[in-house]
Amino acid sequence: MNQTVSITENFDGVSIDHLKTLPAGVKFITEDGHGVQDNATMAKAFAICTQKDITVMSHAEDMEISPWDYRLAEDIETVRNCWLSEYYQTKLHMCHVSTRGALDAIQMAKLRGAPVTCEVTPHHLWFDDSRLQYKVNPPIRKADDVAALVTAIKDGTVSCIGTDHAPHSAEDKAKGAAGMVGLETAFAVCYTKLCRMEGLPLEMLSFLMSSGPAQVLGLDEHKGRLVPGFDADIVLVDTDHMFTVHADELHSKSKNCPYDGESFYGQVMMTIKGGKVTYQKDRQ
């Protein structure tokens, strides 16, 4: 069992005493969609996690900076957390990295020996801020940030792709909730963008969406590969078939889909979980 616990108790931003008594089954801590703002608190949390072999998962956002510059807010907190990872040799996973500056910090930290991994999302690869103004956190970035994400995938800086799937209801979106659905479209978006448009080998995309996440989560002894003895978790796709996304046909409880009306290659035809078919698309 792999459980995640908040970095600070009840997300209060300062209390970390609970980390000292976490059971062995807890392998990750995260403040979810927030960054811990206090430097000393975060440093102490990193020190504890090194002792207990816990990975820190970080949404990087300096809340004092974000009201006037979202990009700088991500960059600054990414730099801080990477330095803490290097100093304490704490395993750090940077979630939904979206800026060139954050990637630069991660690359430099890795070169210095910091145990840092990172992920990017399909929507930060597909959209830039000239094409979509959609409330999501981190925000949709500039075209040069998107190009940097693609480069970081190709050079191995990026460890995996994560959907950051956020199925908010229409009512919650109307109230300003940040996020979008992206689970059902994730492979097609990434395959079309990375493989069809950017020339990424399909084998590398498969790694980023299977073995890569399994390694980050410490599940790679039984998930992420098609070999005897591993869990039979399989996705079958038609890489030659182009299809159009229709939000009203999604299975998610939410329809807040920014890809509505867009066409992609790589339609998912079947999913198998633990050897059992959990989804099968009807052929038209």
Model-inferred region functions:
Residues 72-91, 154-155, 159-161, 166-239:
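His/Asp/Glu-enriched, well-ordered alpha-helical/loop segment
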Residues 14-161:
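Histidine/acidic residue-rich metal-binding segments in metalloenzymes
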